[in-house]
């Protein structure tokens, strides 16, 4: 598992997205047996000079962190993908670059996703926070819960809000970023920024010259300069899936793209699996709420996308959260990962049964999948009504939305 897993993040903005909406999506490709949980954290005021303990290191905390909902591998602090109360969504991709990623423990790319969500009120503000933390603390450490070898990667990010998106790609502390205001964009496990960069590390080009990767005379092409020699720069399967859509892109379109195994967007291989997925819809009309759909389970083609809306009193969903092992967690003790505890949450365990039934391809499996899709459809239609309503949703009715969807899903699995 030395290469970065084939993972995809997408955004569609008007005019390609329907009805003045921004649609965001990601499949998280991770080791097959890894469990992801969906966790909500409310906004919190912190004491002066307090610290926040990330996956491997502690850093200075800020006075206030925003409310966030994230999907994350259950052993780490950060997030593969998520959203905050201000309508900011961030996804992370592991990248192989010309310069090997540091194995020394620092911030993981996934830590930076969560830090960006907790501290940023716009996509651009989150980007500025991430590159500042990158400069201060660096990135490095094992991306997998693996005691036998260190799998370290550089990181790319897709940062999205109601108005725009940013692609941020990093190599060590160096970075480049591009602003996107219309159309579609996909990022995967290859550097994608070329000659159009709206912002960059002030020493990016000097560093490239010092390494002998750029003469200073040719036009500076970020991906060409920083990609490995054997990297195929234009092989993002997700890019084709998104660009070939002829009609306006909706939440359902994005879900269909994430479920597509034939294209490679939904990975299901010997080593890797799409262990969780997200689709978010961000209305440019600020009187409408942002809606975030999480699976919380592996393989989106056999999972239900369940909606979440930020309100002041969100009901927590323990059934989608993994057991907490505290300071005894093998991920927190050094040497790390000497044991591998059972991190499966209740939803994951129930879904294991459902996947086995569906994979058997018997009548029961076909009936179950049909029921799951019908359940999902009801949720999507209810959210469409909320988006089309001139009135904001009643917080009392949507505070337990994700909880109720998980509860209903599990009842179908019993």
From Swiss-Prot:
Signal peptide: none annotated. It is found in: Cytoplasm. It comes from the Eukaryota. Keywords: Cytoplasm, Exocytosis. Transmembrane segments: none annotated. InterPro entries: Peptidase_C69. GO terms for cellular component: cytoplasm; nuclear membrane; nucleus; presynapse. GO terms for biological process: exocytosis; proteolysis; regulation of synaptic vesicle cycle. GO terms for molecular function: cysteine-type exopeptidase activity; dipeptidase activity. 'Secern' is an archaic English term meaning 'secrete'. Belongs to the peptidase C69 family. Secernin subfamily. Regulates exocytosis in mast cells. Increases both the extent of secretion and the sensitivity of mast cells to stimulation with calcium. This is Secernin-1. It comes from Rattus norvegicus. The gene is Scrn1.
């Amino acid at each position: 598992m030395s290469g970065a897993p084939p993972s995809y993040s997408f955004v569609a903005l008007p005019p390609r997205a329907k009805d003045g909406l921004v649609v965001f999506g990601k499949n998280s490709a991770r080791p097959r047996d890894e469990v992801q949980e969906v966790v909500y954290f409310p906004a919190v005021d912190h004491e002066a000079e307090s610290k926040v303990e990330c996956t491997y290191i502690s850093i200075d905390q800020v006075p206030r962190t925003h409310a966030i909902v994230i999907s994350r591998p259950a052993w780490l602090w950060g997030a593969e993908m998520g959203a905050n109360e201000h309508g900011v969504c961030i996804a992370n991709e592991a990248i192989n670059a010309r310069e090997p990623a540091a194995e020394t423990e620092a911030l993981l790319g996934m830590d930076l996703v969560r830090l960006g969500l907790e501290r940023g009120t716009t996509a651009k503000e989150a980007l500025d926070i991430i590159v500042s933390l990158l400069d201060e603390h660096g990135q490095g450490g094992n991306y997998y819960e693996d005691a036998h070898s260190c799998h370290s990667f550089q990181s790319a990010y897709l940062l999205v809000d109601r108005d725009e998106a940013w692609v941020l790609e990093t190599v060590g502390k160096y970075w480049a970023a591009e602003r996107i205001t219309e159309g579609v964009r996909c990022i995967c496990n290859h550097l994608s920024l070329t000659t159009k960069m709206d912002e960059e590390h002030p020493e990016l080009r000097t560093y490239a010259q010092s390494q002998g990767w750029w003469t200073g005379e040719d036009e500076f092409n970020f991906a060409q300069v920083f990609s490995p020699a054997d990297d195929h720069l234009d092989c993002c399967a997700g890019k084709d899936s998104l660009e070939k859509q002829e009609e306006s892109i909706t939440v359902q379109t994005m879900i269909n793209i994430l479920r597509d195994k034939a294209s490679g967007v939904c990975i299901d291989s010997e080593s890797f699996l799409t262990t969780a997925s997200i689709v978010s819809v961000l209305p440019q009309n600020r009187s409408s709420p942002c809606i975030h759909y999480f699976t919380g389970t592996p393989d989106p083609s056999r999972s239900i996308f369940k909606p979440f809306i930020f309100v002041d009193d969100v009901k927590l969903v323990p059934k989608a959260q993994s057991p907490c092992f505290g300071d005894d967690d093998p991920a927190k003790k050094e040497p790390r990962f000497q044991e591998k505890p059972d991190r499966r949450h209740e939803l994951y365990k129930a879904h294991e049964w459902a996947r086995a039934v569906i994979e058997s391809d018997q009548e029961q499996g076909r009936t179950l999948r049909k029921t799951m899709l019908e359940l999902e459809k009801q949720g999507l239609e209810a959210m469409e009504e909320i988006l089309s309503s001139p009135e904001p949703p009643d917080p009392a009715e949507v505070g337990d939305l994700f909880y109720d969807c998980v509860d209903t899903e599990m009842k179908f699995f019993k």
